[in-house]
Amino acid sequence: MTYVIGSECVDVMDKSCVQECPVDCIYEGARMLYINPDECVDCGACKPACRVEAIYWEGDLPDDQHQHLGDNAAFFHQVLPGRVAPLGSPGGAAAVGPIGVDTPLVAAIPVECP
């Protein structure tokens, strides 16, 4: 089991969770952050740090957020648009930096005007 970042993060990316993660497993896409399920140690430090309440324990995902369980994993295991290989488990987000692209699910979410 792992923690999952849901749709509340899209176009917000508060990033307070990134600072709390002891294993640096929260990666930055273009519009959303993603938790690498293979690197997450399930400590839960990220959840209370998230100011927009976008982080869920896998077993507590609301029905309207279930698609993000697979989508968080897809960010690391599938070839993202514009890339030639899956990101995989690089061993920490800081060394990789912002990825600059999102999964097709997140990219398809309409941008809300302020």
From Swiss-Prot:
GO cellular component, one term: cytosol
GO molecular function, one term: 4 iron, 4 sulfur cluster binding
Positions contributing to [4Fe-4S] cluster binding: C21, C40, C43, C46
Induction (free text): A member of the dormancy regulon. Induced in response to reduced oxygen tension (hypoxia), low levels of nitric oxide (NO) and carbon monoxide (CO). It is hoped that this regulon will give insight into the latent, or dormant phase of infection. Induced in C57BL/6 mouse lungs 3 weeks after low dose aerosol infection with H37Rv bacteria.
Entry's cofactor comment: Binds 1 [4Fe-4S] cluster.
4Fe-4S recorded as keyword: yes
Key words, A-Z: 3Fe-4S, 4Fe-4S, Electron transport, Iron, Iron-sulfur, Metal-binding, Repeat, Transport
Ranges where the 4Fe-4S ferredoxin-type domain occurs: 31-60
Domain of life from the UniProt record: Bacteria
SUPFAM superfamilies associated with the record: 4Fe-4S ferredoxins
InterPro entries: 4Fe4S_Fe-S-bd, 7Fe_ferredoxin, FdxA_Actino, RnfB_subfamily
PANTHER family in alphabetical order: FERREDOXIN, OXIDOREDUCTASE
Protein name: Ferredoxin
